[in-house]
Amino acid sequence: MKALLDLFKQVQQPEVFDAIKIGLASPDKIRSWSFGEVKKPETINYRTFKPERDGLFCAKIFGPIKDYECLCGKYKRLKHRGVICEKCGVEVTLAKVRRERMGHIELASPVAHIWFLKSLPSRLGMVLDMTLRDIERVLYFEAYVVIDPGMTPLKARQIMTEEDYYNKVEEYGDEFRAEMGAEGVRELLRAINIDEQVEMLRTELKNTGSEAKIKKYAKRLKVLEAFQRSGIKPDWMVLEVLPVLPPELRPLVPLDGGRFATSDLNDLYRRVINRNNRLKRLLELKAPEIIVRNEKRMLQEAVDSLLDNGRRGKAMTGANKRPLKSLADMIKGKGGRFRQNLLGKRVDYSGRSVIVVGPTLKLHQCGLPKLMALELFKPFIFNKLEVMGVATTIKAAKKEVENQTPVVWDILEEVIREHPVMLNRAPTLHRLGIQAFEPVLIEGKAIQLHPLVCAAFNADFDGDQMAVHVPLSLEAQMEARTLMLASNNILFPANGDPSIVPSQDIVLGLYYATREAVNAKGEGLTFTGVSEALRAYENKEVELASRVNVRITEMVHNEDKSDGAPAFVPKISLYATTVGRAILSEILPPGLPFSVLNKPLKKKEISRLINTAFRKCGLRETVIFADQLMQSGFRLATRAGISICVDDMLVPPQKETIVGDAAKKVKEYDRQYMSGLVTSQERYNNVVDIWSATSEAVGKAMMEQLSTEPVTDRDGNETRQESFNSIYMMADSGARGSAVQIRQLAGMRGLMAKPDGSIIETPITANFREGLNVLQYFISTHGARKGLADTALKTANSGYLTRRLVDVTQDLVVVEDDCGTSNGVAMKALVEGGEVVEALRDRILGRVTVADVVNPESQETLYETGTLLDEDAVEEIERLGIDEVRVRTPLTCETRYGLCAACYGRDLGRGSSVNVGEAVGVIAAQSIGEPGTQLTMRTFHIGGAASRAAVASSVEAKSNGTVRFTATMRYVTNAKGEQIVISRSGEAMITDDHGRERERHKVPYGATLLQLDGAQIKAGTQLATWDPMTRPIITEYGGTVKFENVEEGVTVAKQIDDVTGLSTLVVIDVKRRGSQASKTVRPQVKLLDANGEEVKIPNTEHSVQIGFQVGALITVKDGQQVQVGEVLARIPTESQKTRDITGGLPRVAELFEARSPKDAGILAEVTGTTSFGKDTKGKQRLVITDLEGNQHEFLIAKEKQVLVHDGQVVNKGEMIVDGPADPHDILRLQGVEALSRYIVDEVQDVYRLQGVKINDKHIEVIVRQMLRRVQITDNGDTRFIPGEQVERSDMLDENDRMIAEDKRPATYENVLLGITKASLSTDSFISAASFQETTRVLTEAAIMGKRDDLRGLKENVIVGRLIPAGTGLAFHKARKSKELSDRERFDQIAAEESFEFGTPETPAAEQQHSGE
């Protein structure tokens, strides 16, 4: 019987669908869903526990409580399936229909849906063109609204108070109609003729000129067009029928003691039903208007609370005074349906336990506790037991397993063989946080983890726990084995470096074994082979570090490539090496030369070694090699027995004198301050400077002493060798600790910061070895506590950044091999402050070329367009001195939905070209988000110590080569023959013999050039010098000075220098000027030529006028002759405010959110000539006249620093007012490539500061997603509205259609959206709703009748399908093509049938819809 029942409960085939549509339900639709009206607020009878009839749990409406059994018990059993009991009215069927059958409530008075009323911008307001305030007054019965003005002078939609209404009624009688409440609003909505309105708005839009109106009309048009397109009637925003959720979804559970636990929804529904019934009764009794009105208002409020409690007014509360959880609360937020149940679920067949180290495991194995394995693989074991005939039934099998008989353990071994399990450590910040391993059964209760995968999991063994998951199906096991097995994931997807790098003991052991010592035992011996050296070592004839000569056999690549020839051939050579290195040479994989081991192995070296092995010998050899490295490291570290003691921390003897000298200097500054020679701030800055220098000096002295030790060599001479001090070795090898930490142990702790980030000027002169006194200890608690508080904040912030990044990129998948674009970006080495920060080879590695790479010497093509550049290629490019390579980038990829493999290039986690189906968006988001917790949270104040060091006064070349100036460099020659720079953004480059850029330096305005373009120079040559303390104002033309508006006491003041007695004129601040007139003028200089005429700017009618900024010291006199390049005035740089620099995480978030910085710099909108117009109050007016003679004005605050002067020619996009750049301006004026360069470089700066490596392409992928919307400038013949923002792919599809129909396509400009905004504005409403602002997203989608094509990953996870990435992409493609071929077959059969019988064919349209 049970089996029979199960037969009927067979799982229905899941519906196959391509898209999900959302809309507003009409009242008839709601009634059609319903299985009956809920008339009573009763739930269940507390004595019988049976649901009340017509109540919220009524069995007649919602279905039976027990399977195939009616309520009164007349019909039981399967044979009555589908009968409706005549006594209790219940249909005999499965009880689970109570999860899907809905009811409804007929409302006595219509009610407005709060989402469309209150969710901003109010949709009701938009449609009716009324303010939200007015609509609310009407809905909540505070005012009347005119519905039909008739022949009266009243206007439709006019609001009037009750008094007004009665007056008008007296005046006009029943000429006009006005209503209150939702009825009135519904009438208005019904009266709207959408087509008419849309036409009207479109014409208005074309004819109006005011910005505000255009904005308003466009918004309203968008909403109305949405209604028009979706076929949803606006009056459906007012409910007449309220659907009731199926009872199983709002359960009522009896607790012991006769109480019930219930879902809040039941409470909310009860209120609605109570008020509705009361209203019905009042209407039947023809109660006074005021009572009815009050009841209607209460009904409206009850429905509001049910839909979205707390959205308007005070939230309804239950018996325990907490707000009730409404329908809206059920779906939104972290605990809502989307994020709690759809995007993250609890998983069957999983377990978790503490992890311990498993040094004996292979890389692809993990130790699984026996009991855990038994529990996880239970069904498999039951099956095996039945198949083998040990147990006859599942029940018997269960018993066997519970008794843990020997046969069960044998079977477990068998089941587990070749069946990978997945291990996961939370937080899973990148894809290496879940990896598959083959389980090895172990005793105990802890999971054993291989030491080399700890780096990827970020795991340690101080009590970390990990979860185990079992892939059940064969496909899942296959994917786990091929894609997720730990030995297949040995590179970080973020940067392509190996993730299986040894750390701690392993590094220490390898380092110790490969160090060399002077005059160790047996130095200078020669051995015939490694085995002989090993024998000598084991007989204590030599030490590990002894320098010896050994014959070593290496396996090298065979030159003979013929068939049957071995791939590797042995090559024997004698090496001068150490015993330890020779012994290690045994584990070298074939194909790697011994030279890679013939040096002290530090952590970085080992990482490089594994990387080389992977590139040269392939995955399998590398994994084996890494495992052997680990085993050797552990063994050697154990044998070495390195330990530390207090005496290892050597305090340098010079420390006392260094600290003493510093204290003297500080005293001197204190004395100067007391006598008033320096200000308090200067004294503080200097003191901090002194102490940080002292700290450095002590640290340096300590490291010098620690890092070397004296020894006697074989010939009896005293020499020094690298120290074998344990602490030094740990730090030097990279096993543990760093120079900074050693400095605190044995040098001095140095300066500490207060919680607000400012530095305490009293340093801690002691170190941990000497011990801190009470005051010093107290000072250091500050920093420690701030560190802990910061860490907690950082984790949350970093997690939120990752979530936003994943959300914006989740639908970006590689969908084709090549989009065929010819666009790309030019990649150069990244040079900052004259140093190469990132070499060209690192930036183009793994990219596809978009133009031929040409050998500069022979001009022949090295690499064709479309070549994927690998390690050999980039090395060749570097060797030839090519300084710029054009490569493909995700930014310019022309694939519509997704990316192509060529634009992305190499998959960094696999080391080969990226596969179609790779979810590159999510990988990019994880790569940027994962190191987020390592970034700081602080904002740097530049001022004091930091800026002191930053003042440079000259720039010198770091390498030999030729000087080259950029196109923006402009200079004049003054009377002394010196070249004075007059450009603001000029840069000097040094290029080598091949013309490749080696370094690049900014040369500021007013600098004196010492070398000119094309000069051949040696390293160390000065290129330019300048005065760091002042900024000059320089004339580009000669002539006689004529002052304008330079009046003493009005615009300038005379200052007399105390020391020299010379007087200078200083331009005074606007605020300090006396008369009103003098506030608007600007002191400036004009130049006169020999005839007394004003000197004009060449080729223009403008006279030369040079304005003086506030605070400028004027150094020339009226009437003085000046030559070209002479200084007219100087501005002391001290007066510049120190500005905060946002660093760390907040900076990254700021960049990705595309926020405009406050006090942003201003860029020139056009190319043209600058001049200053009439100043307004507190602002100066800068005018740029373009080449056609059109003028563009900028108003600039007086305190801002203008970087241009009168008559200067500026290029479009050039900075004209100093300040941080605004990414939106860069995009508008300089284009996508400049924007991407800006964002990539800025983000990389933050990460580089923390020593984190992230590949550029990940950031480019995010920028692509930030640019995925465009703004329509001219709509042509398309359906778009000018100024509307639309998805780029939509716009391109629409334009393609227009071009195909010979109509005018739309023109557009790029828009940069921050990641939050970009996620919310995605086409998929499911994805947007599950991210943030759920209510707003769903409201908008419902009105527009949006359809979600389920293109992204999130949408598919939510509806429970395979994601369209990886193996899922192929699955979906196959499914779609199968559907197509099925449909074609169906059409063909239909055609044949109709041909035979002469029946008309079904119209194609119907067939199209049947698929949706």
Swiss-Prot record:
It is an enzyme of class 2 (transferase). The RNAP catalytic core consists of 2 alpha, 1 beta, 1 beta' and 1 omega subunit. When a sigma factor is associated with the core the holoenzyme is formed, which can initiate transcription. Belongs to the RNA polymerase beta' chain family. Binds 1 Mg(2+) ion per subunit. Zn(2+) 1 binds at C70, C72, C85, C88. This is DNA-directed RNA polymerase subunit beta'. Its cofactor is Mg(2+); Zn(2+). Its EC number is 2.7.7.6. Zn(2+) 2 binds at C819, C893, C900, C903. One of its GO terms (biological process) is DNA-templated transcription. Residues 1391-1412 are annotated as: Disordered. HAMAP family: RNApol_bact_RpoC. Mg(2+) binds at D460, D462, D464. InterPro entries: DNA-dir_RpoC_beta_prime (IPR045867), DNA-dir_RpoC_beta_prime_bact (IPR012754), RNA_pol_asu (IPR000722), RNA_pol_N (IPR006592), RNA_pol_Rpb1_1 (IPR007080), RNA_pol_Rpb1_3 (IPR007066), RNA_pol_Rpb1_3_sf (IPR042102), RNA_pol_Rpb1_4 (IPR007083). It comes from Paraburkholderia xenovorans (strain LB400).
